[in-house]
From Swiss-Prot:
InterPro entries: L-lactate/malate_DH, Lactate/malate_DH_C, Lactate/malate_DH_N, Lactate_DH/Glyco_Ohase_4_C, Malate_DH_AS, Malate_DH_type1, Malate_DH_type1_bac, NAD(P)-bd_dom_sf. This is Malate dehydrogenase. Disulfide bonds: none annotated. Substrate binds at R81, R87, N119, R153. The active site is at H177 (proton acceptor). The gene is mdh. Keywords: NAD, Oxidoreductase, Tricarboxylic acid cycle. PROSITE patterns: MDH. Catalyzes the reversible oxidation of malate to oxaloacetate.
Length: 311
């Protein structure tokens, strides 16, 4: 099993690489790429950790060598948010980066499962899809927007609010991956009930958690460590699915035939071909239905921005 991380020298990329080095199945290969010249050194640094995962680093303009034979590609390359920026401000820089990297994936590892971490995910996933379509290799079951950070934040905040064991908390998160498009389905959390005020407060905190980190870091970056953990969880789930493990379910932003928008975050079953099955997200409360319906114009506009960028 070969996993490639593109943008591996950044804050998310290094955290993700460390976690993958310690958690990938024995015998796996970890391929790290970045435009920054430090990345071969990051690979050497990681190679001293005693796990049976081979690590190689590739620097420079061309990621082809890093991508050869990759089963999973996780893309975290791009610039991070700073105070005063929202995820859409990142579009002007990150759109071109994602386009160029996905073009290389299409040419080098067209069957790989691709997880897009680079923000704004609502838009960058649409860019990736259009690039893959242009190359004639698009498979909607092999492209994912990684929204796992919204899930782990939801699980953490609910466990804290209700004094639960976080390992027992499961919160599906649907929609997209920015602001109002992030919708945790708190009505579906088992064995716990919330007041209307709690639901409103938790939902807002989950939606604004990225900004909470950006402001707390005071200009020193955005959510890198928690995002690295979230991306590792999702990447390992992709690997487990590829290896034939049953019942591997994660929420992800996918082209899953949603009635709402072309791309929509919802639970999916992962398997040997990427998405084996898109799961219905089930019954929602009136609050959640209203929040879902209110986000759709924003989400559609984000998606259209990505489509237009590639055209």
């Amino acid at each position: 099993m070969k996993v490639a991380v593109l943008g591996a020298a950044g804050g998310i990329g290094q955290a993700l690489a460390l976690l993958l080095k310690t958690q990938l199945p024995a015998g796996s290969k970890l391929s790290l790429y970045d435009i920054a010249p430090v990345i071969p050194g990051v690979a050497v640094d990681l190679s001293h950790i005693p796990t049976a995962v081979e690590v190689k680093g590739f620097a420079g303009e061309d990621p082809t060598a890093a991508l050869e034979g990759a089963d999973v590609v996780l893309i975290s390359a791009g610039v991070a948010r700073k105070p005063g920026m929202d995820r859409s401000d990142l579009f002007n820089i990150n759109a071109g980066i994602v386009r160029n990297l996905v073009e290389k994936c299409a040419a080098t590892c067209p069957k790989a499962l691709i997880g897009i971490i680079t923000n704004p995910v609502n838009t960058t996933v649409a860019i990736a899809a259009e690039v893959l379509k242009k190359a004639g290799v698009y498979d909607k079951n092999r492209l994912f927007g990684v929204t796992t950070l919204d899930v782990i934040r939801s699980e953490t905040f609910v466990a804290e609010a209700k004094d639960l064991n976080v390992a027992d908390v499961k919160v599906p998160v649907i929609g997209g991956h920015s602001g109002v498009t992030i919708l945790p389905l708190l009505s579906q959390v088992e064995g716990v009930s919330f007041t209307d005020a709690e639901i409103a407060a938790l939902t807002t905190r989950i939606q604004n958690a990225g900004t909470e980190v950006v402001e707390a870091k005071a200009g020193g970056g955005s959510a890198t460590l928690s995002m690295g953990q979230a991306a590792c969880r999702f990447g390992l789930s992709l690997v487990r699915g590829l290896q034939g493990e049953a019942n591997v379910v994660e929420c992800a932003y996918v082209d899953g035939g949603s009635e709402h928008t072309e791309f929509f975050a919802q639970p999916v079953v992962l398997g040997k071909n990427g998405i084996e099955q898109v799961l219905a997200y089930g019954e929602v409360s009136a609050f959640e239905a209203n929040a879902r319906d209110a986000m759709l114009d924003t989400l559609k506009a984000d998606i259209q921005l990505g489509i237009e960028f590639v055209k």
